[in-house]
Every structure is written in C-alpha cells, then in structure tokens.
Amino acid sequence: MNSLTATAPIRAAIPKSYMHIATRNYSGVIAMSGLRCSGSLVANRHQTAGKRFISTTPKSQIKEFFPPPTAPHVKEVETAWVHPVYTEEQMKQVAIAHRDAKNWADWVALGTVRMLRWGMDLVTGYRHPPPGREHEARFKMTEQKWLTRFIFLESVAGVPGMVGGMLRHLRSLRRMKRDNGWIETLLEEAYNERMHLLTFLKLAEPGWFMRLMVLGAQGVFFNGFFLSYLMSPRICHRFVGYLEEEAVITYTRAIKEIEAGSLPAWEKTEAPEIAVQYWKMPEGQRSMKDLLLYVRADEAKHREVNHTLGNLNQAIDPNPYAAKYKDPTKAHPNKGIADLKPTGWEREEVI
C-alpha cells in the first residue's frame, strides 16, 4: 500500500524559512480561533455547558448549533437514504490504499489532489509526519485541531456528488434519456458527506473566521468542479477517488491517536445522537473512536465508488451500484463495505 504525502509542487517553490513562519502563524490562527468546542472535548467534564471557549460568536447567541425545527405536529423528519449497517469487523478492515496513476488523466487528478491537500493542511494546521516522527511536537494534533480539519474537509466534500448529480440530471433532461442510476448514487454521496459535517458540528461550532474560509473554499471549489465536470467527468471521478484516499489517511491517523491515548478528551466522548440514529450505532459502540470508524468506512466507500465510476464509459455505462446482476453468487459492487475494493472495480468486472 502506498499513501500520499502532503508534498506538492508548489511547496518546492517557497523557501523553507518562509514556509515555516507562514504555516505556524496562519494555521495557528485558524486552528485556535476557528471553532468553539464543546466542554467535553477540550476542558474538564465538570465545567458547565455555558462555558465559552475561543470564539467570535456573541455570548447571547450561544445555543444548540442547529436545533430541531419547532413544529408541534412533527415528531421527526425521515431521510430518503437509509444508511447501510456496518459491522465492527468490516470497519476495522478498512485500510489506507492508493490507486497508481496509469495515464495522463490520472496524473492530472492526482496532481490536483496533492496541491489541494497542501492548501488544506495549511489552513487547518495539519502536518503529516514522516514515518518514525509521529511523536514530535510540531506534528502533534489536538482535539480542536482535528475538529477544525474534519469540519473544513466535510464542508467541501459534499460538493462533488451534488455537482455531478446535478449535471447528469440536466443532461438527462436535455437529451431526454435515462441516466441509468448515476444521479441517485452521486446525490446520496453528497448527502452522506453532509451528514458527516452535521455530526461534527454537534461537537464544535465554527467561528466567523472558519465560516469565511468555508465560504471561500466552497465557492471556488464548486465552480471549479462544475467546469471540470463539464469537460471531463472521468477525471473528476478519479480526482474524488484520490481525494477520498486522503480522507481515509486523515481519519486513520486520528483513530490511531485515540488508541494511543494522545487525545484524552475524546476517550470519554460519546457520539452525538444524530450519528447514533444515522449509522444505527449499537449500544456500547458509540464512542468517538467508533464514530470515526463509521466516517472512515464511508470515505473508503466513496473512494471505491469514484474510482469505479472513473473506470467506466461516462456516456453509456450503467451505474454498477444501482444494478442487479444475473449471478448473485459472485461479488459485485454494492452499497455496503463487505466486498470493498479500495482501488475500484475495473470496467470488465462490472459491465
């Protein structure tokens, strides 16, 4: 297996001394002032719920970040997409993987991901440690820094699926032809990424600076991905596949740090109720580590789905994740992670 690093071509063009100063100062501002974390994460559990941490939010506005709707006659709002049930064994088998670039289109996608990875590392204060240097102080991540990274990552991760689904929907209307199942899978992916974001927002509320960064990143990314998908959907799906490889790396490292005791505030933190309901988390498996295992499994599934879609003929092939196959005894693409293929299914395997 081969994991990607945060190294990008742009980094080589910046003097080391300047890069160190910029990264330390700029990422520090975001990591420390971008969020207001819940008391159970960064402070003693005996502190009151009204205790305010570093934030730009006025005191009078402190309340649940997104409370349920005030509709007396509505009990709850159901989702159209029910999440598949993962077993603990399946989630623990998820591993870091990398699909080798095989042609110029793959290299374009991979190079773009590496450049974006560098930018995301900068704004979230994350530094990926080389092997054997994980315990050095400059690579240490706190609970607050991890939440900053998770929220920023998930706030833009829901864009590709929505853009792809929207463009394929319009294409189907314009050509007056069926889409053969692509739209549903892409929209469901966007919905899943949004649920990741809503879950993490139950643990920390972004301040004005974080909101500004998300607004700018989402605006640029949406328009850039929109134009790119019009030009080459296949490169875009490969790009998302590589991006999800990075997401698996991020969550894997966070899980390992919890296991190593490096994030003590998360050892007793329970998953929010929104996560328990969405993933159907069983009793006794609702810790912060369990939550990250579920999120990582989702990212691994998106990695497989987009690498698979990137292998297909975008114009005529049906979506293998919405297809019923003639031979049910053989492994085929599905919504679960029982037959997970980290680098995607090849076209000859599914079409």
Swiss-Prot record:
Gene3D superfamilies: Alternative oxidase. Its main location: mitochondrion. InterPro entries: AOX, AOX_sf. Fe cation 2 binds at residues 193, 244, 299, 302. One of its GO terms (cellular component) is mitochondrial inner membrane. GO terms for biological process: alternative respiration. Fe cation 1 binds at residues 154, 193, 196, 299. It is found in: Mitochondrion inner membrane. Catalyzes cyanide-resistant oxygen consumption. May increase respiration when the cytochrome respiratory pathway is restricted, or in response to low temperatures. This is Alternative oxidase, mitochondrial. It comes from Aspergillus niger.
